């Protein structure tokens, strides 16, 4: 078995799987390492559903989303498999976020529609907002079939010659005479490039970062309708993916149809509690992560039972100081070491675009999408 590679990708979540696939696709001999068994639920990439959307308050995200769509369309064609469902995105806000998104989408020529809060209920009877709210509909928004994305990128990676080792723990990485080495509990590999896509474990492998990385424990809540006869209003054919921002309260929520658990839609508070315990087994069920969605549902979603969630799952966000991704080199590290991380709860949809950009960087090429906005050079050294 070979121990010499062009690229070793550490971490086989969605960022790592997309990165490894794109590296191998452009001719880089690539090894993908995962500390847990494939299919584990210890990080940020498990579950059946995620949101995809062009709509963003920062225009720098839009082209990454477009690149991700193109890759998914290609995989659907190659595999003959449906990897997402176009439901449309409903973005509602009490502040001026809708205007920001409208400006960005107009600049990029992306089809969308701005509506008044009072008009939302006419489109989607699940909701009832007053004129203090504004809405935007992104028709290309939809449900990512998250588990299928992971399997697709890993399968295609292996089909074109990529190697995956799961249950293999990286112990260290080093540089000797301009060569990079990765030492695991099973072997030692040499590589021209190392790409870390390790989620909340980033500080384990890069402990000397000059800025703070914050892992967050998230409670993912699911809710049913008050009356079973209305349960169809929560399925993919009737329920959009949703971003809801109460800007006056600084409370942000997101929601998806009942893809994960039929009859129960996903509706979650977008933040959680700092994760200080075992990263693989985060604490969950912080009461505010239940109370805040419940309060919103009771106030704005008349057909949904907001008394208590039907189920609570766990997930981990990894946040950078400004909640944007980190893509590329780290100023204090060897330039042949790259990082793709800090998805901050929104990175799944752009993982194919991030993976392609990292692969192009590893090959010494100009990136198809400008990702300079996500460079770690934007951070000043932390005082902590």
UniProtKB/Swiss-Prot annotation:
Modification type S-8alpha-FAD cysteine: residues: 315
Keyword Oxidoreductase: yes
Cellular component terms (Gene Ontology): peroxisome
InterPro entries: FAD-dep_OxRdtase, FAD/NAD-bd_sf, MTOX
Family matches, as Pfam families: DAO
Cofactor note as given: Binds 1 FAD per subunit.
Enzymatic class: oxidoreductase
Entry EC number(s): 1.5.3.1
Catalytic activity: sarcosine + O2 + H2O = formaldehyde + glycine + H2O2
Cofactor (UniProt): FAD
GO molecular function: flavin adenine dinucleotide binding; L-pipecolate oxidase activity; sarcosine oxidase activity
Keyword annotations of the record: FAD, Flavoprotein, Oxidoreductase
Residues where FAD binds: 6-36
Gene3D superfamilies per UniProt: D-Amino Acid Oxidase, subunit A, domain 2, FAD/NAD(P)-binding domain
GO biological process terms, semicolon-separated: L-lysine catabolic process to acetyl-CoA via L-pipecolate
Family listed: Belongs to the MSOX/MTOX family.
Descriptive protein name: Putative sarcosine oxidase
């Amino acid at each position: 078995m070979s121990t010499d590679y062009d690229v070793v990708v550490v971490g086989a979540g969605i960022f790592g799987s997309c990165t490894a696939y794109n590296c191998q696709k452009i001719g880089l001999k690539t090894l993908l390492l995962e500390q847990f068994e494939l299919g584990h639920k210890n990080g940020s990439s498990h579950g059946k559903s995620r949101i995809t959307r062009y709509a963003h308050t920062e225009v720098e995200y839009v082209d990454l989303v477009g690149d991700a769509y193109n890759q998914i369309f290609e995989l659907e064609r190659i595999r003959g498999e449906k990897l997402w469902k176009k439901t449309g995105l409903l973005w509602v806000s009490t502040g001026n976020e809708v205007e920001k998104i409208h400006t960005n989408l107009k600049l990029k020529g992306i089809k969308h529609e701005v509506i008044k809060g009072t008009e939302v209920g006419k489109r989607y009877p699940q909701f009832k907002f007053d004129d203090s709210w504004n809405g935007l509909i992104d028709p290309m928004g939809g449900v990512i079939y998250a588990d299928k994305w992971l399997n697709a990128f890993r399968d295609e990676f292996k089909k074109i010659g990529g190697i995956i080792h799961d249950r293999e723990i990286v112990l260290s990485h080093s540089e000797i005479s301009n060569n990079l080495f990765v030492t695991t509990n099973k072997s030692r590999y040499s590589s021209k490039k190392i790409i870390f896509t390790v989620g909340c474990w980033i500080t384990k492998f890069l402990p000397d970062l000059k800025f703070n990385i914050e892992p967050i424990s998230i409670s993912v809540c699911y809710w049913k309708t008050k009356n079973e006869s209305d349960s169809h209003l929560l399925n993919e054919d009737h329920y959009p993916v949703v971003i809801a921002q109460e800007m006056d309260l600084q409370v942000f929520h997101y929601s998806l149809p009942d893809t994960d658990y039929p009859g129960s839609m996903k509706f979650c508070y977008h933040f959680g509690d700092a994760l200080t315990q075992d990263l693989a087994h985060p604490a969950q069920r912080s009461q505010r992560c239940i109370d805040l969605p419940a309060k919103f549902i009771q106030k704005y979603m008349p057909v949904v039972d907001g008394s208590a969630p039907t189920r609570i799952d766990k997930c981990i966000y990894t946040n950078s100081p400004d909640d944007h991704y980190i893509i590329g080199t780290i100023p204090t590290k060897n330039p042949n070491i790259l990082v793709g991380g800090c998805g901050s709860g929104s990175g799944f949809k752009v993982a194919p675009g991030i993976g392609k950009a990292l692969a192009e960087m590893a090959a010494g090429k100009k990136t198809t999408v400008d990702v300079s906005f996500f460079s770690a050079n934007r951070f000043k050294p932390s005082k902590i």
